[in-house]
Amino acid sequence: MVKAKKQYGQNFLIDKSVLAKIIQAIPKEMNNIIEIGPGLGDLTQELLKISQVKAYEIDNDLIPILKKKFQKELECGKFNLIHQDASEAFNPSLDEKPYFLVANLPYYVASHIILKALEDKNCLGLIVMVQREMAEKFCAKEGNSEFSSLGVLSAMICERKILFDVDPQCFNPPPKVMSAVMSLIKTKDFDELCEIENFKNFLKDCFKAPRKQLLGNLKTYKAKVLEVLSTLGLKENIRPHEICVDLYLKIYDKLKDEYGRKQRDK
């Protein structure tokens, strides 16, 4: 029996009914799937029934187990196993062809990988299992106290949905928190809307004190922000979680030269 390793945030999914629900949720036309952290290969086995699969696995001890389990699929080219940390594999894409991402993501690296995937032009969307709290952040709507930069970024380019919760007892070892499977289906790319690095820096400033007023978080640009809020008919004491994506893009549009300059001066 292989023991899960804490340093990789491993919690092996052992509930077959959860695997079935994940497979059912994958859009039918997806025929190139990337999996991150295949673990013991239980989800991989189901994915291979509907698509070719490329899997990224960081754990040395799991590579021979996966090679043995999927020897036939590896030989015929239906399965491609990459021994690499997936978070370092976006150069800039996880694959040269359009792909759909499916994963039970380690909690410590989940937000980083999801954002990288959203920025990857070849990624069509993703269905991932993450900590319930993180799924709520990615799928939150404006006005909800959970609405943050993660919610803004995902709402900009995706149709978003929390599909179902997953109890700790569905894993070995059981995590200390509730998990959830969420779906982010891309409808556009960031570069159709903004220069993403500058926009992320702008959002970082907007949400640096999420319960404070937006004007206070952007006090460096107070005069311009006041002008924009007035033009858009927004109250001066509005808070970051109360602003929708379209308005964030409009506010950023007035400040983008400042953020472009900041990026160049780094």
Swiss-Prot record:
Binding site for S-adenosyl-L-methionine: 11, 13, 37, 57, 85, 104
Localization per Swiss-Prot or TrEMBL: Cytoplasm
GO cellular component: cytosol
Domain of life according to the entry: Bacteria
Reaction equations catalysed: adenosine(1518)/adenosine(1519) in 16S rRNA + 4 S-adenosyl-L-methionine = N(6)-dimethyladenosine(1518)/N(6)-dimethyladenosine(1519) in 16S rRNA + 4 S-adenosyl-L-homocysteine + 4 H(+)
EC number annotated for this UniProt entry: 2.1.1.182
Enzyme class name: transferase
Main location: cytoplasm
HAMAP family: 16SrRNA_methyltr_A
Name this polypeptide is given: Ribosomal RNA small subunit methyltransferase A
Annotated source species: Campylobacter jejuni (strain RM1221)
